[in-house]
Amino acid sequence: VNRMLPLLGFLVVAALFGFGIYWTVQHNPREVPSPLIGKPAPAFSLPQLDQPARHVTRDQLLGKPYVLNVFGSWCAECVHEHPVLMAQAQRLGVPLIGYNYNDAPADATAWLARLGNPYAVVLADETGQTAIDFGVYGAPESFLIDAYGVIRYKHIGVLTPDVINDELLPAIAALPRGTP
């Protein structure tokens, strides 16, 4: 029996390891459902990146659906996503609004000047406070918000052409028509 204990211990560890791998494969952390889906977007008032004296509020954006894209000049994945946004922004059929997260405005402005600006407007959140209200884990993340200000879709990670074609565009097409 004493000689079986090491083997039994090994089998338990191997089983736990195997379960961990299985669970990780089955539960993609990018598919974490947001508790905000179907709920009004949090209230916010954020300065525009290019005109800090001008603030944009959630209520000013009511009446038209839009995609809110969270990015930062410090974000390596955002560099991969950016050419896709440059190429696909017009295809969305709704405004693409940039949400610059935890970033120095000068860095974000230089980043957009270098890579191009696909956004209708860019909001600046240097401290990341509003991001907490949106449940942002990091960048990039994207939200589809309908004309009534309700969050209809959230994507954690890079928006690829496949994600845009297979998820975001169908979500936009499914939005209720009309204005509030």
Task: For the regions a language model picked out, list residue spans one by one.
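Short gly/ser/thr-rich secondary-structure transition/capping motifs
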Residues: Q26-N28, P47-A53, V122-D125
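A short beta-strand-turn-helix
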Residues: F44-V67
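Aromatic-flanked redox-active Cys/Sec active sites in thiol-based oxidoreductases
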Residues: N69-C75
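Hydrophobic beta-strand anchors of alpha/beta hydrolase catalytic cores
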Residues: V67-L68, L96, S142
